[in-house]
Structures are given as C-alpha cells and as structure tokens.
C-alpha cells in the first residue's frame, strides 16, 4: 500500500485492517473503547533532506521564547514545508550533538519530516556546515530585557514586553474570530501604546485609530470605523 500511496487521488496516512464480518467484530468486543477486531497502521513519516538557513527566536504571549528553524522549502506529504519549531534549548543541543559547540548553524544539512503528515519537524542533522553557530539568546529579542530559564524553556523576564502584549491581544482576537484585525494592526497599536491588554481594544478612540500609521499610510476613518464595529 505504501508504494501505491502517491498514485492515489486522495491523501491517506495509514490503513485499518478489520474483520469483514460484523458478528465476528462484535463478538471480540472492545478494549479501551477500541474494537479488538481491527488494527490501525500508520505509514512512517515522510522525510527529506534540506539546508538550514536561519533560527528565529519568537516571543509568545506567555513570555516563552521559542526557536523556529527556517530551511530551504521541501515538498512533504502534499505540502510545502519551510520552517519548523525547535521547541526549546534542550532540543537544539540534542539535534546538534555532533555539531561544533553543540549548536546548529547556517548551512547544516538536515533531515525534516511532517509528523503524522501534519506537523513540520526537524529530525536530525546529517552534515554540519563549517560556519558560525546560532547562539542561544541572553536577552529577549523584543524588549531586550534579560531572559530567565524556567525548566526547559527560555522566558522573557519583563512583564510589559511588547511581544507578550501583542501576543495576548492576537490570541484574544483569534479566539473571538474578530474580522479585519490583522497582526500588523495589532502590532502597530501595541507599539504606539494604544493597547496594553485585550480590554483596551474596547476603549480605542476612533480619531486616534484613524490616524494610526500602518505600512507607511494612515489607517483612515472608514477602515477605523469598520474594525471598531467588528469588535461588537
């Protein structure tokens, strides 16, 4: 079946083998909510080699600073993949066990996959490049305050970090599915101090919002009116 997978007109990630007899299936019963007369099998993760180009440390709304690997895009299981989360510092050192200084570097030849044909994943380093290594940050990439280690994760120590504020607002907007509130608009509002918490969205002034500079242009009254209306 695995050899015929690519020729199918639809995506599959495995197969299920079961009795072709309803009475036999029922007589075998279940275990943990799963029928004993059936077995599911998953295909191995599709993997391809590529070249690591960059690591960007992103600040989440909780203050967690997560490394994201960017690499030459490859086609995997029907999707084009060009980036993958590295999760934390410990995972970087695990992957870079045979690399100079125990760190990843630009030009490293890596193996990437899509776990369960969904999640991009950096599996291993095949050949380390003879280049400078990507360092582990000592300060937050957003507010430049010192970082702290909490378990396996690096955290920003500044409670008013702009990236944390904008991250919390973006999460709120996404959760409520508020239309026309893009990331660039939220970033601009947080950068100019108009919004410090999600609650501040509901106290925005129409004039101030209309005069907000976004991408080299002011937002304008009609757009400002529309985005404010979409809050309710």
Model region roles, listed by residue range:
Residues 1-232:
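RNA/tRNA-interacting regions in translation and RNA-turnover enzymes
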């Amino acid at each position: 079946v695995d050899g015929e997978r690519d020729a199918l007109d639809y995506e599959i990630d495995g197969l299920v083998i079961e009795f072709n007899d309803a009475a036999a299936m029922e007589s075998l019963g279940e275990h943990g909510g799963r029928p004993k007369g059936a077995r599911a099998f998953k295909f191995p993760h599709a993997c391809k080699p590529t070249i690591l180009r960059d690591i960007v440390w992103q600040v989440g709304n909780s203050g967690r600073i997560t490394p994201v690997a960017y690499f030459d895009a490859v086609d995997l299981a029907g999707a084009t993949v060009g980036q993958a989360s590295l999760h934390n510092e410990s995972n970087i050192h695990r992957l870079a066990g045979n690399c100079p200084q125990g760190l990843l570097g630009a030009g490293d030849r890596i193996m990437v996959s899509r776990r369960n044909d969904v999640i991009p994943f950096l599996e291993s380093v095949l050949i380390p490049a003879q280049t400078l290594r990507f360092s582990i940050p000592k300060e937050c990439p957003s507010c430049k305050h010192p970082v702290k280690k909490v378990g396996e994760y690096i955290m920003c120590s500044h409670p008013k970090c702009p990236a944390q504020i904008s991250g919390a607002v973006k999460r709120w907007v996404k959760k409520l599915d508020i239309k026309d509130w893009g990331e660039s608009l939220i970033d601009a509002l947080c950068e100019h101090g108009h919004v410090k918490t999600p609650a501040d969205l509901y106290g925005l002034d129409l004039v101030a919002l209309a005069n907000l500079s976004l991408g080299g242009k002011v937002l304008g009254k009609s757009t400002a009116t529309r985005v404010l209306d979409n809050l309710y």
